[in-house]
Amino acid sequence: MRVDYLKKLGPGLLFAGAAIGVSHLVQSTRAGADYGWGLLWALIIVNLFKYPFFQYGPRFALATKKSLLEGYFKMGKIYLWIYFIINIATMFTIQSAVTIVTASLASKVFGITPDLIIWSLIVTSICFSILLIGKYNLLDRIIKWIILALTLSSITAFLIAFTNNTSSLSFTQILPEGNKLIFLIAFMGWMPAPLDISIWHSLWTIEKNKNSNKLNTKEGIDDFNIGYLTTVVLGICFMGLGALVMFNSNLEFSNKGGAFADQLINLYTSTLGEHFYIFITVAALTTMFSTTLTTLDASPRAMEKTSQLLFPKNKSFNYLFWIIILSIGTSSIFIFLLSEMGKLVEIATVLSFITAPFYAFLNYRLVISNQMPEKFKPNKFMRILSVSGIIFLLSFTIGYLIKI
């Protein structure tokens, strides 16, 4: 692959960095720990049905030179107001959730202090500094190295676990029943990521094309496909780690992300040896740091654009304003509401999950509307997959609401 083409890669890797987080390290691994390879079908099918809606982010941005948010606004101001309210309701707790898992892993890897509040503030400060000093261009460069380290360490950790496995492997697929069905619904809802990340991707694509390494539509979709394939492969790797190292271990696993990640690392090293510790810790830490960094960039970027469209006369609601607000809000949750973190994350998770059909419908409607140039509209296969995906997401959302 040519060096100049590698320089053009960016938004798709940022997507991967944002997507490969709690959904992979915690939920995919948990699926493997509890069901072995039994939920592999769910991982594959949900990635298939969500694919078009994520892809429409860069497709629309490159074809129209506008973000999905601008498309929503043109379809109707009400859609943007809904997004604004949902984002305000979820962005602080989601940022806090990914940061606390990163802090837990950093505490384990670097020691210094076991205080998660201190580590959370350190992680937030590092990410804030990277984004404030280097802005998008530094983020674009850093994420390529993070994703490379993440991919190599995760695949290596999986291969080590696979080659050291002495138990027979079962690929019998399972459909959980009763209360266990709730885990399946949540797993599929967050794999590989909530659908509003398609909005972030469209904004990153617009930002990427402000520099000299501009993407055309084909290159942009190729860039996305590389990022998306990475999320799928690593989803399988983390499920495999759970299946190979944690399944049938007769241990009770924590429902808290940081504690579960700690259990994974401890069990991995105790099963395979201390000399393999570095591979699983690098995989886990880079997984969560990439999510923390990209999320801290994306939410303020999305809120800046939303504010520009909804409040055109107010110029103060810019990127700097929102990243400061998000950083302060996140830090405040660590300091004052850490004991309520579980409930706050649950609320944010439910809101993000039940809005998936909403974003799927909006993205599909947008790319077949007259806002989209005819030659860039999805083909027949993508349209069929999109309609099937909307039905699929709607069905699981209704199923989730019935069960809770």
Give each language-model segment a name.
Residues 12, 84, 109-132, 148-159, ...:
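Transmembrane alpha-helical segments of multi-pass small-molecule transport proteins
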Residues 15, 42-71, 82-94:
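Juxtamembrane transmembrane-helix boundary signature
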Residues 28-30, 55-78, 106, 110, ...:
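Flexible loop linkers connecting adjacent transmembrane helices
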Residues 30-55, 70-74, 78-80, 182, ...:
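Extracellular loop-to-transmembrane helix junctions
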Residues 43-56, 219-249:
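Selective recognition of specific alpha-helical transmembrane segments in multi-pass small-molecule
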Residues 63, 80-111, 120, 288-307, ...:
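Hydrophobic transmembrane alpha-helices that form the core helical bundles
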Residues 122, 130-161, 175-178, 346-356, ...:
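Membrane-interface loop-to-helix entry segments
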Residues 148-175, 184-203, 359-374, 396-404:
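Hydrophobic alpha-helical segments and their helix-loop junctions in multi-pass secondary transporters
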